[in-house]
A protein has these predicted regions:
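Charged/polar, solvent-exposed surface patches and flexible loops
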Residues: 12-15, 19, 90, 97
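Glycine-rich, aromatic-bearing surface loops/beta-hairpins
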Residues: 72-122
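Short, conserved loop/helix-junction motifs that constitute active-site signature segments
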Residues: 65-70
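Helix-adjacent hinge/juxtasegments
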Residues: 14-53, 58
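Conserved RecA-like ASCE P-loop NTPase motor core of nucleic-acid helicases/translocases
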Residues: 1-6
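Short, charged/polar "capping" segments at the starts of alpha-helices
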Residues: 7-12, 83-84
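Short glycine-rich anion-binding loops that position phosphate/pyrophosphate groups of nucleotides
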Residues: 60-62
Length: 122
């Protein structure tokens, strides 16, 4: 599930996923179609109706109740936007407070570097 409250972002993701990779495409659909439950990747703003094992949160989207049980929950945000950084920190605190494992990754010099990690409470 790719979740964004921004309709323009959802439309851009939809268009991009039809075009890449060059030798194919990533099967997906926009939320609200007749086959939402069958989509390998569902793009929308609501809950995952496609048995998603992971949720990608974009543009300040919030996790929904029960999504802490997902295999993975990604929060993508602009590290140069203080409001987005503060919101991501709040999500980190809430999610780790629920006992979820968490990792913070930052893009540096064209590669991803893990900055910190919180293991689940045992």
């Amino acid at each position: 599930m790719l979740r964004s409250p921004n309709p323009d972002r959802r439309d851009r993701l939809d268009a991009k996923l039809w075009l890449e990779p060059e030798d194919g495409f990533l099967p997906h659909g926009l939320e609200g179609g007749p086959f939402d439950a069958d989509q390998p990747v569902l793009i929308g703003q609501g809950g995952a109706t496609n048995a998603a094992q992971g949720v990608v949160l974009l543009d300040g989207a919030e996790p929904l109740p029960g999504e802490e049980a997902c295999e993975r929950l990604w929060v993508l945000f602009d590290g140069d936007d203080p409001v987005a950084v503060q919101a991501a920190r709040g999500l980190w605190t809430r999610m780790t407070g629920l006992g979820m494992a968490a990792q913070y990754w930052s893009e540096e010099t064209r590669r991803w570097v893990m900055k910190t990690e919180k293991k689940p409470a045992e």
